[in-house]
Amino acid sequence: MRRLLCLLTLTSGLALANAQDVLAQDQGPEPQSAASVENVSIPATQDIAASDATAQTTHQVSRMLSQKFGVAKAKAEQISAAVMSAASKYSLPPALLLAIISIESRFKEKARGLNGATGLMQVVPAAHRKLVRNIDLTEAEANIEAGSAILHGYVQSARGDVGAALKSYGGSTAYAEKVSLQVQKFTPQTEPATAGD
C-alpha cells in the first residue's frame, strides 16, 4: 500500500512539473532581469569604427594603386583588400606588404623573376613547396597570402626583427633597406584619415 501511495505521489508530482514546463513554453521566455540584460552581446562601437577605418584605408590604398601604379580599379580594390586582410592575419604593417609588392613586381600579378619567382610578392615555389602546393601564384589573393605567410615566418624566426626577416625574404641587407625606404612612402596611405584631414 505504501508503495502504491508513494508511486501515485511521485507520478502526480512529475505530471505537475511537466504541466508547468508546457505552460512556460506557451507563455514564451521569462522576462530578463536588468542584471541579465547587461550580459547581452551588442557589437561594440569600437569594432564598428575599426571596420569603417579598415574600409576607408582599403579605399585609400586602392585609389593610390590606380593613380600611382596604373592598376585597374577593380584589380586595385582586390589587391588592397588582400593586403589589408593578410596584414591583419599575420600582424604585419600593410605599408610593409605594399612596399615589398612595389619592389618585387610593381603590382603586376603575372610578374616572373629569377628562380621561378612568381606574382605580386615574387614567391619562389621551389623554396616553399609545402606552402604553395596547388596554389596559383599569379592570383592576387593567393600570392599575397603566401608571401605574407612566408614573411611572417621569417619575422618569427628573427624574433621580431623585421630587418632580418626582410634580408631573408629578399636575400640581402640592401633589399631590406630598399623596402624600409618604400615603407615610409606607403605609410601615409595605410593609416586611417583623422577627422581633421
Language model: regions and residue ranges:
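Sec-dependent N-terminal signal peptides
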Residues: 1-22
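N-terminal propeptides/low-complexity segments immediately following signal peptides
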Residues: 20-44
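Catalytic glycan-binding domains that act on GlcNAc-containing polysaccharides
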Residues: 42-197
